[in-house]
């Protein structure tokens, strides 16, 4: 598959969700190579989270880590916070940070002046 920025791979995942689970590592590796901004790795993480957070937990974890590293301008990370952690994530930041390294990394990226 030819993919310049991750969109084609994201679309493939969305259109073949029932049959691409065995290829997920390859698909994520491809997105890691071509998605320079994190837009599509974060979109894929959000999509898989909405489909079945438990079933796709490993893939979601990898995609989130890639998104944290790639979204330097913080354009896409914020969209995940409420979906993944609930509307009250800011009030529970200390608790969530202690339990989830990805949360801590995203929160620090979004709110660098935070005392956390």
Model-predicted segments: where are they?
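Solenoid-like repeat scaffolds
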Residues: 1-2, 29-36, 63-70, 96-103
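Alpha-helix initiation and capping sites
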Residues: 3-7, 17-25, 34-38
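Ampipathic, surface-exposed secondary-structure segments
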Residues: 35-68
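Amphipathic alpha-helical scaffolding segments comprising HEAT/armadillo-like alpha-solenoid repeats
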Residues: 19-31, 53-65, 87-96
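Eukaryotic acidic, Ser/Thr-rich intrinsically disordered low-complexity regions
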Residues: 87-116
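Structural detector for internal amphipathic alpha-helices that build alpha-solenoid repeat scaffolds
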Residues: 5-18, 41-51, 72-84, 106-115
């Amino acid at each position: 598959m030819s993919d310049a920025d991750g969109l084609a791979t994201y679309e493939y995942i969305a259109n073949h969700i029932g049959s691409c689970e065995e290829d997920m590592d390859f698909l994520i590796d491809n997105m890691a190579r071509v998605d320079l901004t994190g837009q599509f790795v974060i979109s894929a993480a959000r999509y898989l989270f909405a489909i079945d957070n438990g079933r796709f937990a490993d893939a979601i974890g990898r995609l989130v880590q890639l998104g944290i590293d790639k979204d330097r301008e913080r354009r896409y990370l914020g969209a995940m916070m409420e979906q993944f952690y609930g509307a009250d994530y800011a009030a529970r930041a200390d608790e969530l940070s202690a339990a989830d390294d990805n949360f801590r990394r995203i929160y620090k990226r979004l709110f660098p002046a935070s005392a956390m």
